[in-house]
A protein has these predicted regions:
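An anion/pyrophosphate-binding glycine-rich loop and adjacent beta-alpha core
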Residues: 251, 257-400, 474-477
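Conserved N-terminal glycine-rich FAD pyrophosphate-binding loop of Rossmann-like flavoproteins
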Residues: 68-100, 266-270, 279-281
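Glycine-rich Rossmann-fold phosphate-binding loop(s) that bind the pyrophosphate
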Residues: 42-44
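Glycine-rich loop(s) and the adjacent beta-strand/alpha-helix scaffold that form part
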Residues: 223-282, 451-474
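N-terminal Rossmann-fold NAD(P) dinucleotide-binding loop
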Residues: 47
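Conserved redox-cofactor binding core of oxidoreductases
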Residues: 125-215, 227, 271-285
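Glycine- and aromatic-enriched mobile tails/lids
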Residues: 20, 25-37, 50-53, 57-59, ...
Length: 660
């Protein structure tokens, strides 16, 4: 009999599910909360908001951060904004419209009930952040300003210039700091979770590594929450910070938490192109730029060749010789189509030879028209810090006038190209954000919950704060209300001792390989395999070859890795090696999932399954489910597939259309 997963979606109409859940869930008495401990791993938007909220409720929280400060979490890199259905613009937005756009943007591969709840709590997030003092942009009359993001025909994105993630994180950090000051949160900086401890079938603690001393430390709690972000760095080159890793999630997977839809990896269309083979990360240019920037390539192949050779500049190509291909193909949405659509369109143009830089892997993002229409002052007010960042990296100023012909001003365009950015897949969770391990919860990007096969722009911040501020504080109580869980466990239990010894033995194994290759050299090779075989365009043959190469690179890792130094004290290379071990396993999961899913949907594009127009072609008859993968004893064994059928009550599943 096939294994099944219980998503615990409440009964009743979709608009009433969350309300009914909150009305009937079990609660924990305020006095009893004082007796209960919760571990929260991660201090980004999801982790910081959850830790602060749970502590405010009375729980004792142990919060772990791999950086010197929670303010260095990768959430700080989010630029463009956060979605909410406030409808301040009176342009037709609503909770239902946000819900529908998110499900459609995810190519009908998300759970309806989870997405509706996300849209439902979105407005409360904005109120919470305003109360914290987040300096959202405002219109002349004082109302909060909005702009548009991809996959929407309304303006629902709230923003703080191009620094929205930073400002939201500072708001969450202020709440967290307040609870640290009261003693309700014990914050452990420069600590990394190395394993989850299971006692009587439940998550009851973690083994953490003090990254400064190198020592392993045991922590017990009544529940464990991981908020550790995505796995984009399995591709080596991505927009993720260098420290972003999937070790906590993968360790939970090894202990019995299933992974859901790992092949759903987002390629962001507006990133600064790769500049050389020594590069170690990529830089995101906010999707908000697509509000006022127009994406184009030359109409003539000879112009593209001249751009690639450096004998012609973008501003020298006249308007009539420019192909604004997104506006041409998708007139209803233009440059604001969803990210997967925009990325594939850019790849198609470059594959046809119309790329605009020396590698042929770039397209233009041009602000000439909007600067003339709105004025340079207004454009700089909206995107000034993004223009500065682009100039600092490329030495090109997108706001600088290049030439003027017959009254038409031509500015230096940006060059952009798609890159790995976000992961829609992640640890499987039910409606309560609980994994298949009782007592282990996963929130934010590290779970698979809300975005289906493609996330809409400005929805990552929304999900992280929704989970931390407004969902987990309810659902974790439903679990902790069980009085059998209230006893505090000693970290001297055999389960804790065995987990620590296993981590210690693995560290010793890695240190004693004593091969000839650095962590970075193997990681770079892994990234090349992932991008070439499991990247933007996937095929059956390419994925099969990718799996062979991934098994070979694990062998190379296990036999030829060299880690300098010792395991005692600070050893960044050792930490990176642990991350790389888990990226290899994650890469295999992505490839297995992509190979089994014989369809194209959202960020997962199988070249064998596309329409005549080159759009993603789903197979709803055979693949209308969440693909979940269960660990089988060791890293070498293929994982087992478990299917969670999707159930749609009110949205009609149909082919996505962004053309009209």
């Amino acid at each position: 009999m096939a294994k099944t997963l219980d998503s615990r979606i409440p009964e009743g109409p979709i608009a009433e599910k969350w309300t009914n859940y909150k009305a009937h869930q079990r609660l924990v008495n305020p006095k009893n909360k004082l007796k209960l401990d919760v571990i929260v791993v991660g201090t980004g938007l999801a982790g910081a908001s959850a830790a602060a909220s749970l502590a405010e409720m009375g729980f004792n929280v142990y919060n772990f951060c791999i950086q010197d400060s929670p303010r260095r979490a990768h959430s700080i890199a989010a630029q463009g904004g956060i979605n909410a259905a406030k409808n301040y613009q009176n342009d037709g937005d609503s909770v239902y419209r946000l819900f529908y756009d998110t499900v459609k943007g995810g190519d009908y591969r998300a759970r309806e009930a989870n997405v509706y709840r996300l849209a439902e709590v979105s407005n409360a997030i904005i109120d919470q952040c305003v109360a914290q003092g987040v300096p959202f942009a405002r219109e002349y009359g004082g109302m909060l300003a909005n702009r548009s993001f991809g996959g929407a025909q309304v303006s629902r994105t709230f923003y703080a210039k191009g620094q929205t993630g930073q400002q939201l994180l500072l708001g969450a950090y202020s709440s967290l700091s307040r609870m640290v000051n009261t003693g309700k949160v014990k914050l452990f900086t420069r600590y990394e979770m190395e394993d989850v401890v299971i006692v009587d079938g439940r998550a009851r603690g973690i083994i953490a590594k003090d990254l400064v001393s190198g020592k392993l430390v045991r922590f017990s709690a009544n529940a464990v929450v991981i908020a550790t972000g995505g796995y984009g760095n399995a591709y080596f080159l991505s927009t993720n910070a260098m420290g972003c890793n999937c070790t906590a999630a993968i360790q939970c997977y090894r202990k019995g938490a299933v992974m859901a839809n790992p092949s759903y990896v987002q390629i962001h269309p507006t990133c600064i192109p790769v500049h050389g083979d020594k590069q170690s990360k990529l830089t995101l240019m906010s999707e908000s730029l697509r509000n006022d920037g127009r994406i184009w390539v030359p109409k003539k192949l000879e112009d593209a060749k001249a751009l690639q050779a450096g004998t012609k500049q973008g501003y020298e190509i006249p308007e009539e010789d420019r192909d604004y291909y997104l506006e041409r193909r998708y007139p209803a949405f233009g440059n604001l189509v969803p990210r997967d659509v925009a990325s594939r369109a850019a790849k198609e143009r470059c594959d046809k030879g119309f790329g605009v830089n020396n590698t042929g892997l770039a397209v233009f993002l041009d602000f000439s028209e909007s600067i003339q229409r709105l004025g340079i002052k207004e454009i700089l007010q909206r995107y000034g810090n993004l223009f500065e960042m682009y100039e600092e990296i490329t030495d090109v100023n997108p706001g600088k006038l290049a030439k003027k012909v017959n009254g038409v001003e031509y500015y230096h365009p940006m060059m952009i190209f798609p890159a790995i950015h976000y992961t829609m897949g992640g640890v499987w969770v039910d409606y309560e954000l609980q994994t298949t391990i009782p007592g282990l919860f996963a929130i934010g990007e590290c779970n698979f919950s809300d975005h289906g096969a493609n996330r809409l722009g400005a929805s990552a911040l929304m999900q992280g704060l929704a989970d931390g501020y407004f969902v987990l504080p309810y659902t974790i109580q439903n679990y902790l209300a069980d009085q059998k869980l209230w006893a505090r466990l000693s970290t001297d239990l055999p389960e804790f001792e065995a987990a620590e010894k296993a981590v210690e033995a693995e560290i010793d194994r890695l240190m004693n390989i004593k091969g000839k290759r650095s962590v970075d050299s193997i990681h770079k090779e892994l990234g090349h395999i992932m991008w070439e075989h499991v990247g933007m365009g996937r095929t059956k043959e390419g994925l099969q070859e990718g799996l062979k190469l991934l098994k070979a690179i694990r062998k190379e890792f296990n036999e030829n890795l060299f880690i300098p130094g010792t395991k005692e004290g600070l050893n960044i290379e050792l930490d990176k090696a642990i991350h790389l071990r888990d990226f290899i396993l994650m890469g295999e999961l992505i490839a297995y999932d992509a190979l089994h899913r014989e369809e194209s949907c959202g960020g997962h594009f199988r070249e064998e399954h596309q329409t005549e127009e080159g759009e993603a072609k789903r197979d709803d008859e055979n693949f209308f489910y969440v693909g979940c993968w269960e660990y089988q004893n060791n890293d070498e064994s293929a994982p087992e597939l478990i299917k969670e059928p999707l159930q749609y009550e009110i949205i009609k599943v149909q082919q996505r259309n962004y053309k009209n």
